[in-house]
């Protein structure tokens, strides 16, 4: 009996091997051959052909990352603080009904908390999963690779309004005018020749329900933090940088008063970084009034309109025009076109391209525009694994691959 069991296992293994060989040697379809000629590895072509069959007008172009290996990029992206996963119990969409979003599988072991304590370092497996383009070649998530040039056919005001849904800007007016944020974003996008749908998605990601940076109340927040003794405890995560060490900056804030810092806006959260809430918000204020902002980007940003228009121009110049012309490339800045600013990533939130892609594809779908000729630029790394990187949550997370 034992010998039979061994033989059965051997036969099963042999059949599996034969099946794998047959699959590997299967002939490619004409469209798959076209993709391979363009430069896509065979590990991409099945998923891309499936998308092509559903949307024949879609165009897929490879971005060859030939001067860096997959491992070299992964090592760099695993640097402390580069890729963070939210620490939250909030669950969007269908995950709200389940009662969880399951972010935990993406945390690094003994993960360090960042910023206000609401973010954890991503594990190496999580970085590999989010960095691997093959993880997201489906009808919804593929929009992280959409090019961000202006296209009046798809980027209508209705789509922009749908993209803003769930944020404080949805169907809302700005600066005590009767004009809506969607009107403003469309106007700015057309003027800059950059997708207003992309701009709307980025504004939603950065502001959501509305932060002090979007409401012109940065000073109130700074004064509150500066005068709260409990928040000034050494190593408290609401503090950061020099403010945590000597308090000199906080004394100046208290002496000046909140109104000195109120009335300034930073909708794209440009420069809003640091190791605590105080430092993050102070740096957001500093960007809004900086010499460069005033000289090149319509500053100081004393109105919501100025902050949206000026911030959008800076995003376009630094990112869209700087070799980062997809949502993916603004997180994983691997394009050779980026030159000396190759590693200049827009955000630390590892899931930002995925979140923006989903809100974008949803808006296009609801507007009946999914069959337009979108162009997707998808990175291909040198020496990347033969199979897609696995999802640390094994399909059971809001960050797992998702169709529309």
Residue ranges and their predicted role:
Residues 205, 216-220, 257:
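Short secondary-structure boundary/capping segments
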Residues 211-217, 222, 293-296:
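Catalytic cores of eukaryotic secretory-pathway lumenal/extracellular enzymes that build
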Residues 197-199, 211-216, 324:
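Short, solvent-exposed secondary-structure capping/transition elements
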């Amino acid at each position: 009996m034992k010998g039979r069991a061994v033989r059965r296992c051997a036969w099963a293994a042999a059949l599996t091997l034969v099946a794998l060989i047959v699959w590997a040697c299967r002939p490619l379809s004409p469209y798959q051959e076209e993709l391979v000629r363009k430069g896509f590895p065979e590990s991409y072509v099945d998923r891309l052909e499936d998308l092509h069959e559903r949307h024949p007008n879609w165009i897929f172009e490879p971005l060859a990352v030939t001067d860096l290996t997959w491992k070299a990029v992964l090592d760099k992206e695993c640097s402390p603080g580069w890729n963070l996963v939210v620490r939250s119990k909030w669950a969007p969409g269908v995950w709200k009904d389940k009662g969880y979003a399951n972010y935990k599988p993406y945390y690094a072991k003994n993960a360090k908390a960042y910023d206000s304590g609401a973010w954890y370092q991503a594990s190496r497996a999580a970085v590999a999963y989010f960095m691997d383009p093959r993880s997201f070649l489906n009808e919804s998530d593929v929009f992280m690779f959409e090019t961000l040039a202006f296209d009046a056919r798809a980027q209508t005001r209705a789509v922009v309004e749908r993209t803003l849904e769930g944020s404080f800007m949805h169907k809302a007016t700005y600066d005590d005018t009767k004009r809506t944020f969607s009107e403003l974003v469309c106007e700015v996008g057309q003027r800059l020749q950059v997708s207003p749908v992309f701009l709307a998605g980025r504004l939603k990601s950065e502001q959501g329900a509305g932060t002090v940076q979007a409401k012109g109340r940065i000073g109130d927040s700074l004064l509150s933090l500066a005068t709260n003794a409990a928040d000034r405890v050494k190593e408290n995560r609401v503090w950061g940088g020099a403010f945590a060490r000597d308090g000199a900056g906080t004394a100046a804030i208290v002496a000046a008063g909140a109104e000195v810092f109120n009335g300034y806006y930073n909708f794209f959260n440009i420069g809003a970084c640091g190791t605590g809430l105080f430092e993050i918000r102070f740096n957001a204020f500093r960007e809004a009034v900086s010499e460069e902002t005033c000289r090149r980007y319509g500053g100081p940003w004393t109105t919501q309109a100025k902050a949206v228009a000026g911030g959008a121009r800076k995003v376009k110049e630094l990112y869209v025009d700087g070799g980062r012309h997809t949502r993916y490339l603004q997180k994983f800045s691997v394009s050779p076109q980026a030159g000396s600013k190759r590693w200049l990533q827009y955000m630390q939130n590892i899931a930002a391209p995925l979140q923006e892609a989903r809100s974008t594809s949803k808006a296009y779908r609801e507007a009946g525009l999914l069959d337009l000729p979108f162009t997707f630029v998808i990175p291909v790394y040198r020496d990347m694994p033969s199979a897609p990187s696995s999802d640390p949550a094994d399909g059971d997370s809001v960050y797992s691959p998702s169709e529309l």
